[in-house]
């Protein structure tokens, strides 16, 4: 209507609720953080509107997470001047433009994971690379049977003009779109500010997980009553990324003049959980 002064998102964190809401366990899970204030991916959109360096990829880039192995458009949340995308160490593209220009630092869309690779890796000319890239991306998006007629005709023209066989196209598709077999694909996002890399995210298949625990305070001080601290726990891979499918049990054990507030054993949800500790008033 043009009369809105602003808006805010609901809500900051997950919370316990009553019998009429929740997800079967009376927890509302629509926070941008979980109940222990571990940030979910959505929190990166809000954090990126500030000035402290932020970089988060909206996907783990795992083809097994998507129908037909097609990752599709991925959104990157950052407040950098630009974000560079690398595949196995080779520069794919540089992200700068966004359709949401009204935001101070809008999300950046990755809808082309081939970029300049056909030129730098296959040494194709610019026109040939652009034509092939368009055809390969269309095949990935629609599937060969579902490709629009104009894309099929473009593919045929490309084969005739550059004397390519169908098997040549299949090989390029497997290498640059399908990413099946062969060595594991390593994706890297580098956020640059004033020409310097300020944040970097590396995504690759991983089975080496570890726990990260962060306390909301380093010192507890009793006054008229006990003091309390929140302990946030995340399950991370070797590159510091949350393992979102790690629904693993986490056991807490306390020694000394502290009491555990909550269950001794909990289960990580989305690779995250937490607990609270309080002083014993001794």
Question: For the regions a protein language model found, what residue spans apply to each?
Answer:
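Edge beta-strands of extracellular beta-sandwich domains
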Residues: 94, 196-211
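Low-complexity, acidic Ser/Thr/Pro/Gly-rich terminal tails and inter-domain linkers that flank the onset
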Residues: 204-224
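Short, solvent-exposed loop/linker segments at the N-terminal edge
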Residues: 63-69, 219-229
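Beta-strand-rich structural segments
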Residues: 74-78, 227-244, 282
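Short, well-ordered beta-strand segments
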Residues: 30, 90-94, 247-257, 263
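Low-complexity "stalk/linker" and mucin-like segments enriched in Ser/Thr/Pro/Ala/Gly
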Residues: 103-112, 256-275
